[in-house]
Amino acid sequence: MNAKEFLIELLKFKSVTPNDDGALNFIAMELSDFEAFFIEKEGIKNLLLTKKFKDEGEHLAFGGHVDVVPAGEGWSNNAFAPVEKEGFIYARGAQDMKSGVAAFVDAVKNADFKGARLSLILTSDEEGEAIYGTKAVLEWMQERDMLPDYAVVAEPTCVKKIGDSIKIGRRGSINGKLLIRGKQGHVAYPEKCINPVHDFAPVLKLLAGFDLDPGSAEFSPSKIVITDIRGGMEVCNVTPNDLKLMFNVRNSPDTSLEDVKSYVEKICHGLNYELELKQSSEAFLTNIDNKIVQKMNESVQKITHEVPELNTKGGTSDARYFAKYGVKVVEFGVCNDRIHAIDERVSIEEFEKLCLVFKDLIENF
């Protein structure tokens, strides 16, 4: 089947995280000339497809996920019965990211690769906790000395049109919980209470929206963003016993968890508080002079006639795991204007260009 037909079939699988619904088997059958390794960990299904072309040379991999977020209510059609209409295909996962998966499957089928090995790393655990997916496959590959040299993750990176954005890194994510302790009491006797809201009020302006670093050419500043704050019992005559606050920092490599800890401790000095911090993902950056960045840039410009912005914007992705294992990685895919949305759709023209970009990359790597 051709690329569009393959995409439409792939979109029919109701592969809501972490259930692949048979999508991984379907892909393995399409690439029957590749070795297939089904790698399962803690009930999560993953698939490594790999093909050796020669003994010496470079190993290029593509990464992606077949799982999707739930469709929810309000769709014009069944979210898992793809509809082609006015140049678009409508279905859950059309942009995020079954179009990317279908594009690199088509590319590896049709491209003339001159390197040593091509691999496809696929998971059904990206939209969830993403602990036993791509990371588990890379761990398996490392144990067998099979790690790729370079990788492309086909996440939907473009903003307004195909070719306008390549991701060369991602910010990390640090989650924080702050508890300010007080002493509950009657509102008419504030002198007998310790009001944590009053105590914390001067500190709030030092925390909310604070930039922990100035940013760089590749990364925006690491900003403290408050996501939740609450205290009291929703009554007007009792002061709160404590104040609870949650925040997140999307951090660049210039700001660490220890930097966040030091700053919060400094501004909260003198308060009775507890701080809990957790790094949920690490920041990474692939140098713009690296071969994978240069070759991807060349292929994107050649096929789309756009000059892409090389950036690190957005949330986290499985590309961070490739970077953690020393693999030089970039991300490129279709536009992301409808990801996780009702009536998610992908432009057929964009998808066809993505197939050509990946084919050109493989043939000129």
Swiss-Prot record:
It catalyses: N-succinyl-(2S,6S)-2,6-diaminopimelate + H2O = (2S,6S)-2,6-diaminopimelate + succinate. GO terms for molecular function: acetylornithine deacetylase activity; metal ion binding; succinyl-diaminopimelate desuccinylase activity. PROSITE patterns: ARGE_DAPE_CPG2_1 (PS00758), ARGE_DAPE_CPG2_2 (PS00759). Keywords: Amino-acid biosynthesis, Cobalt, Diaminopimelate biosynthesis, Hydrolase, Lysine biosynthesis, Metal-binding, Zinc. Zn(2+) 2 binds at D96, E127, H340. One of its GO terms (biological process) is diaminopimelate biosynthetic process. The keyword Transport does not apply. It is an enzyme of class 3 (hydrolase). Transmembrane segments: none annotated. SUPFAM superfamilies: Bacterial exopeptidase dimerisation domain, Zn-dependent exopeptidases. Binds 2 Zn(2+) or Co(2+) ions per subunit. Homodimer. Catalyzes the hydrolysis of N-succinyl-L,L-diaminopimelic acid (SDAP), forming succinate and LL-2,6-diaminopimelate (DAP), an intermediate involved in the bacterial biosynthesis of lysine and meso-diaminopimelic acid, an essential component of bacterial cell walls. Belongs to the peptidase M20A family. DapE subfamily. This is Succinyl-diaminopimelate desuccinylase.
